[in-house]
């Protein structure tokens, strides 16, 4: 068991993270199940490789910066009419959901596997955004203001958040020749899909944020 985990953990984590990217928006239950498997695999690998794990100082400083940000955000969760609910959302968004970074930083060392995860993310975002545009054109299952959320029943705000996150990343990957050709092509496809997706999503915030980022990056 130990030798199998040490030998295959990198590939298993790569596959699980890719599957999670492709399933969470359409099925939260399945996405959370896969996410739990990622955390479990990470914990098992940490135990078996506990004497080998080392975190570079360059990464540690970002970790401490993130902890500082959490301490700054935490009071906003505590100053609420329903502290139980806001605290739950705080830990879900800023702690639980961020744990996926750990296996990527600690155990996925192959650049090919990292590029594969990035390509999967770009392709998925392109398809997700195109589905929102199709929903908008067909008038299917639209939210308030005629806005589309993508993936049939996707969240409008969730899509807007992902568009704001993914658009500048895809723009950088498309322009940076250091990335492999297939990553840059997936980024270009993602950019095309996300432009149409922003049209379907009708989020003024995503248009404004991505417009500013587009000018700054290019």
Which residue stretches match the model-derived regions?
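Transmembrane signal-anchor hairpin modules in multi-pass inner-membrane enzymes, especially those
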Residues: 1-85, 109-119, 173-185
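Residue-level micro-sites within transmembrane alpha helices that shape
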Residues: 9, 24, 31, 75, ...
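Membrane-embedded alpha-helical segments of multi-pass membrane proteins
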Residues: 29-48, 91-102, 158-167, 208-215
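Aromatic-anchored transmembrane helix interface
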Residues: 62-70, 84-107, 115-125, 129, ...
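Alpha-helical transmembrane segments of multi-pass inner-membrane proteins
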Residues: 74, 113-143, 153-218
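Membrane-interface helix termini and inter-helical loops of multi-pass transporters
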Residues: 81-87, 140-150
């Amino acid at each position: 068991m130990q030798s199998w985990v040490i030998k295959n953990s990198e590939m298993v984590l790569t596959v699980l993270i890719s599957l999670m990217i492709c399933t969470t928006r359409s099925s939260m239950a399945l996405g959370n199940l896969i996410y739990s498997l990622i955390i479990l695999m990470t914990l098992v690998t940490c135990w078996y490789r506990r004497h080998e794990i080392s975190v570079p100082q360059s990464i540690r400083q970002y970790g401490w910066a993130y902890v500082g940000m959490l301490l700054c955000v935490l009071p906003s969760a505590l100053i609420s009419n329903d502290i139980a609910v806001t605290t739950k959302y705080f830990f879900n968004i800023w702690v639980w959901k961020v744990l996926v970074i750990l296996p990527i930083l600690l155990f996925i060392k192959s650049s090919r596997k990292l590029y594969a995860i990035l390509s999967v993310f770009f392709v998925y975002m392109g398809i997700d955004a195109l589905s929102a545009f199709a929903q908008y054109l067909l008038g299917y299952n639209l939210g308030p203001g005629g806005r589309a959320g993508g993936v049939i029943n996707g969240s409008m705000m969730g899509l807007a958040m992902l568009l704001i996150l993914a658009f500048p990343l895809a723009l950088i990957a498309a322009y940076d020749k250091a990335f492999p050709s297939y990553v840059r092509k997936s980024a270009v496809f993602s950019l095309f899909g996300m432009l149409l997706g922003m049209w379907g999503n009708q989020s003024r915030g995503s248009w404004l944020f991505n417009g500013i980022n587009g000018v700054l990056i290019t």
